[in-house]
């Protein structure tokens, strides 16, 4: 943008805003680069849990990328096989067979499929917890996700919502 310096408003004109306690020096010296912690953060926690729950070996880098997405799909496929006898290939690809095996998940659901949904919502920038309990916060995040993606806003994760989450 061609901006070389940033000045405090009160140094340019007489004013009391934004106040002496405003962290101007800290903000003005920021590089604007994201520096994720490799071992801390919600995505790192999700990555660690995926490795532990599903015997995977993905990098713990606190970055949501293809490796983490594929691992979440593998987790979903594993759970659909275990809980519903879906006989899916656990390949990390959200294809037609995985889509067809998806079930409706709604408020009150508990455990691993709910945890996977919550984890995917976190990875798509929703500020919720991945506790495996489909409560009001998860339902609200699902409704907002559905709204952003042009889906019916019913708070139920069905085939179409799974498809948008995992494609």
Residue spans for each PLM region:
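Short acidic, glycine/serine/threonine-rich helix-capping segments at coil-helix boundaries
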Residues: 35-42, 48-167
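Basic/polar, cationic surfaces and motifs that engage anionic cell-wall
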Residues: 1-42
């Amino acid at each position: 943008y061609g901006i070389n310096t940033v000045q405090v408003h009160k140094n340019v004109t007489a004013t009391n805003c934004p106040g002496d306690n405003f962290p101007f020096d800290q903000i003005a010296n920021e590089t604007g680069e994201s520096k994720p912690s490799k071992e801390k953060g919600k995505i790192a926690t999700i990555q660690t849990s995926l490795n532990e729950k599903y015997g995977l070996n993905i990098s713990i880098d606190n970055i949501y990328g293809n490796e983490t997405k594929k691992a979440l799909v593998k987790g979903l496929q594993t759970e659909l096989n275990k809980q519903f006898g879906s006989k899916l290939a656990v390949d990390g690809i959200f294809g037609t067979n995985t889509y067809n095996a998806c079930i409706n998940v709604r408020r009150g659901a508990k455990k691993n499929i709910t945890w996977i949904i919550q984890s995917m919502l976190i990875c798509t920038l929703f500020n919720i917890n991945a506790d495996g309990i489909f409560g009001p916060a998860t339902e609200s995040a699902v409704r907002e996700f559905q709204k952003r993606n042009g889906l019916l806003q019913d708070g139920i994760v069905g085939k179409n919502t799974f498809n948008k989450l995992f494609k």
